[in-house]
């Protein structure tokens, strides 16, 4: 039986079971553990928080690599343990519609890296291609992009199991995620330095604007982008989304390339391969070319995307 508060038990489990596999090449563990809430011997010891602490502390023994943990939320203070698994997501538009809000407002407890079951995990026997594309688009502009589902042949999510038009869209999403790595990494460094998350509610940057508190599915993706994922099925050829663009800046709509004046809410239509993403005028976005297939090493040429504004001097520190 599991005894998380028993030092001898935990040492034996780590030394006998996990450490040998780490020597064989395992980099980190997804501890998808559904144990009882509190330890059976120590009153009020939360098992999830405790296993996070034990596992992370154990990984710190190897100072040649950065410890990384992937487990469920253990309560306040769990931001110390980097990546959180948000649980088994139900496959539905309603579930997708909740995740952008859930993801960004985790900033309020300093939790910056949620990993969701992109596409949903359970309670369906087949995948709606449109819903999966929209979920992947949200994943593209999330801290972690991880497609996942329960074991069911009808829920396979490899890009090539869909029709060619959907396969092409999914492939481009993955390519764009790779391409965005310099920007994401730069913003991750800022998260490390000042605890400002990559994905955060609009009111973090525009606290004086009432609209910033009303747009629940709209969020900042780093310092320079607004993202409002499509979370409902399209009506005809396009899905519509209301997007609030803060005043004080103009904003480039990535899907169309048009420049829109800030200080208004726009309602645009987006085809299945389009995402409501807006880049602040005056921004410099470092990216890789969309031909990149491997993020190892730092020798990939960086493409600098400039979004000009009137009269501004633009700069960007890139890590």
Which stretches of residues belong to each language-model region?
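Accessory, solvent-exposed terminal regions and/or long lumenal/extracellular loops of proteins
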Residues: 274-319
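Catalytic-domain carbohydrate-binding cleft regions of carbohydrate-active enzymes
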Residues: 1-275, 279-281, 314-315
């Amino acid at each position: 039986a599991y005894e998380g508060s028993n030092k001898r038990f935990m040492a034996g489990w780590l030394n006998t079971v996990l450490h040998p596999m780490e020597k064989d090449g395992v980099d980190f563990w997804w501890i998808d553990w559904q144990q009882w809430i509190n330890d059976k011997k120590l009153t009020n010891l939360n098992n999830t928080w405790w296993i996070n602490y034990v596992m992370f502390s154990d990984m710190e023994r190897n100072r040649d690599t950065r410890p990384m943990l992937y487990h469920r939320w253990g309560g306040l203070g769990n931001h110390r343990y980097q990546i959180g698994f948000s649980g088994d997501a139900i496959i539905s538009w309603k579930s997708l519609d909740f995740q952008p809000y859930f993801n960004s407002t985790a900033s309020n407890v300093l939790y910056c890296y949620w990993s969701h079951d992109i596409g949903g995990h359970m309670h369906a026997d087949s995948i709606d291609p449109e819903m999966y594309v929209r979920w992947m688009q949200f994943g593209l502009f999330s801290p972690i992009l991880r497609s996942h589902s329960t074991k069911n042949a009808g829920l396979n999510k490899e890009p090539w199991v869909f029709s060619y038009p959907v396969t092409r869209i999914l492939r481009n999403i993955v390519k764009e995620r790779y391409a965005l790595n310099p920007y994401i990494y730069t913003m991750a460094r800022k998260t490390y330095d000042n605890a400002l998350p990559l994905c955060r509610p609009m009111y973090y940057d525009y606290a004086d604007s009432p609209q910033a508190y009303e747009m629940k599915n709209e969020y900042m993706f780093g310092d320079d982008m607004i993202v409002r994922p499509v979370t409902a099925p399209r009506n005809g050829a396009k899905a519509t989304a209301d997007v609030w663009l803060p005043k004080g800046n103009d904003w480039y709509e990535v899907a169309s390339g048009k420049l829109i004046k800030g200080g208004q809410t726009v309602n645009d239509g987006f085809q299945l391969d389009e995402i409501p993403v807006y880049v602040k005028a005056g921004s410099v976005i470092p990216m890789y070319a969309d031909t990149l297939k491997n993020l190892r090493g730092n020798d990939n040429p960086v493409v600098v995307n400039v979004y000009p504004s009137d009269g501004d001097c633009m700069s960007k520190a890139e890590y």
